[in-house]
């Protein structure tokens, strides 16, 4: 993965991951039924907006500005990731794009570091949401293992490929994925 290629944002990723974990516990406990069609349309719009914001981020962020990972910026990031964790525990869908938006614009990370940090945060906060749903007997292990294996393999492969190929390939796959998923969510 990323660490084997020398990409790590530890301890920053651990701190924000723990705050996201606490948020996900709250979000998963607040989870309620939402009409699927309305939810899918809202999600497709959110995904497109977040992707556009990442791709069209202000030019000032394209420069050589230092990352913001310590001090008051770490504190602000922890608070925001608690809120992101609530959303992740409640809905989860599109969470990767929300995390990418914040890390790239506020923390000024390049997309390779964004993806490395996102992977750690999602791993940590998913534990809280999973345990909440498990204790409420809402886990389908057949689907879960299938999805988990695909995510694990895909994430490992993508991490190695993105470090090798850089930010440009991440942007390409981000656009393709969001367009296809948004189309599916809106029309199907």
Regions found by a protein language model. Give the residues of each.
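Alpha-helical transmembrane segments of integral membrane proteins
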Residues: 38-45, 75, 116, 120, ...
């Amino acid at each position: 993965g990323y660490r084997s290629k020398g990409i790590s944002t530890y301890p920053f990723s651990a701190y924000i991951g723990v705050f996201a974990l606490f948020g996900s516990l709250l979000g998963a406990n607040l989870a309620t039924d939402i009409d699927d069609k309305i939810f899918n349309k809202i999600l497709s719009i959110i995904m497109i907006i977040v992707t556009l914001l990442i791709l069209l981020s202000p030019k000032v962020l394209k420069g050589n500005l230092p990352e913001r990972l310590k001090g008051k910026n770490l504190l602000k990031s922890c608070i925001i990731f608690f809120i992101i964790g609530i959303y992740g525990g409640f809905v989860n869908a599109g969470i990767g794009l929300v995390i990418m938006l914040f890390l790239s614009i506020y923390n000024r990370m390049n997309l390779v570091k964004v993806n490395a940090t996102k992977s750690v945060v999602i791993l940590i906060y998913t534990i809280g949401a999973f345990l909440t749903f498990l204790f409420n007997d809402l886990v389908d292990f057949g689907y879960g293992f299938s999805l988990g294996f695909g995510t694990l393999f895909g994430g490992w492969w993508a991490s190695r490929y993105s470090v090798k190929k850089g930010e440009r390939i991440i942007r390409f796959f981000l656009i393709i994925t969001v367009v296809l998923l948004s189309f599916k969510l809106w029309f199907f």
